[in-house]
Curated annotation (Swiss-Prot):
Pathway: Cofactor biosynthesis; adenosylcobalamin biosynthesis; cob(II)yrinate a,c-diamide from sirohydrochlorin (anaerobic route): step 6/10. Its EC number is 2.1.1.195. Residues 18-31 have a biased composition (Basic and acidic residues). This is Cobalt-precorrin-5B C(1)-methyltransferase. The gene is cbiD. It comes from Dechloromonas aromatica (strain RCB). Gene3D superfamilies: CbiD-like. GO terms for molecular function: cobalt-precorrin-5B C1-methyltransferase activity. Belongs to the CbiD family.
Length: 393
């Protein structure tokens, strides 16, 4: 996968992963697709360019998305200042049913004539569009966080309608997002080295609700950034609570070392191995830890249930009574086992057994020249144990 594809497919704004469980009203609210920041920016730029050409910004604009689809967008706040050769247009982003941090953003384009620069189109980032400060994103450091696919799409849409405007003059297109600096605080942009605003993203132009492909790509991207910064360790966690726990346990590591892999174990480890990172940590609780013991590439509940035999066998190995072992074998959740064993004072030894099995499974599935350690916490994010690979192999 190319840098352009990988970065473009990263979760729209690489939003902090949030677990929305099956059955939740938020999860069940629908599958309506929406549009990426890149598609909305291209539509705004096309509308503003038409404004310069026609002396009036249209109320609706037809934009060609990166996937080739022709899509109508409603245009707001359109205006033209003919005396200064400037046109302005806004598209309000609709992310569909996806819980997108940038839903409702006012994607704004200002298009200005560049006298005597025939055929030239210059694309800039304005307020609310992040600035790239770190390598690893496939973008120029110091430039705007406008990814390659939407960058081309914006320029293509402008050129498609500019017509005679480009015969003698050029065009400067500035994309901005009012409030983008605040939206960015709800994303992982700062950790990736994108500061001051959101990213302009999207390889197809379409946002699909709860896209697992986007989440997986964001994991790969985060590892790329850590490696390009010269980090020698990466810490994979299964969510926000385990990440906070891992950060407390490893306070000397830079924030960029911490990657919420969610359910995407294979994507995380494959990326770390590709970059030859010498040290890998995993932070997890009992459920995901058990699924790592199972060797699952994706640990989501929809992919596979927790193997209760692993839980029961581990309980037996640490001395749990026979009746409890059978209860664990027929229980609905891994949490049941963890809590019952904790009540018997067996929490540490039980979780150590699981961590040892997880290390063996992970090293078998993802061989490479790296050292692995597993950090385990309880459901409140409190430390239970740490197991290094030399204790397991």
């Amino acid at each position: 996968m190319s840098d352009e594809t990988r970065v473009g497919e990263a979760a729209e704004q690489a939003a902090t992963p949030e677990k929305i469980r099956k059955g939740s009203a938020r999860r069940e609210r629908g599958n309506r697709t929406g549009f990426t920041t890149g598609a909305c920016s291209a539509a705004a730029a096309r509308a503003a360019t038409l404004g310069l050409l026609l002396s009036e910004v249209p109320d609706t604009v037809i934009c060609r998305l990166p996937n080739g689809q022709e899509q109508a967008f409603a245009v707001t706040d359109g205006c033209v200042e003919e005396s200064s050769g400037l046109a302005h247009a806004v598209i309000i982003k609709d992310a569909g049913d996806d819980p997108d941090a940038t839903h409702g953003a006012h994607m704004t384009a200002d298009v200005r004539l560049l006298p005597d620069r025939a055929g030239e189109i210059v694309l800039k980032g304005g307020f609310g569009v992040g600035v790239v400060t770190k390598d690893g994103l496939g973008l120029e450091v110091g430039g705007p966080a406008i990814n390659p696919v939407p960058r081309r799409n914006i320029l293509d849409n402008v050129r498609a309608v500019a017509g005679e405007l480009l015969d003698h003059d050029g065009l400067e297109v500035t994309i901005s997002v009012p409030g983008g600096d605040e939206m960015a605080k709800k994303t992982l942009n700062a950790r990736l080295g994108i500061l001051g605003g959101i990213s302009i993203l999207g390889t197809t132009g379409i946002v699909r609700p709860y896209s697992t492909a986007a989440f997986r790509a964001s994991v790969v991207q985060a590892v790329d950034v850590a490696a390009k910064q010269g980090q020698t360790s990466v810490v994979f966690t299964t969510g926000g609570r385990t990440e906070k726990f891992a950060m407390r346990q490893l306070p000397d590591l830079d924030e960029s070392c911490f990657v919420q892999m969610g359910d995407f174990v294979k994507a995380a480890f494959s990326s770390a191995i590709k970059h030859k990172l010498p040290t890998v940590y995993v932070g997890a609780m009992v459920g995901k830890l058990t699924k790592m013991c199972q060797g699952l590439a994706v640990t989501h509940a929809w992919k596979a249930e927790v193997d209760r035999d692993i839980l029961a066998d581990s309980a037996r190995e640490v001395g749990a009574p026979d009746d409890l072992i059978e209860e664990i074998r027929s229980a609905e959740t891994a949490r049941f086992a963890a809590e019952r064993l904790a009540s018997l004072g067996l929490a540490v030894t039980f979780h150590r057994q699981l961590a040892i099995k997880a290390i063996r499974s992970l090293k078998d599935k993802y061989p490479g020249n790296y050292r692995l350690a597993v950090l385990v916490c309880d459901f409140e994010g409190q430390f239970i144990c740490r197991v290094n690979e030399d204790e397991a192999l």
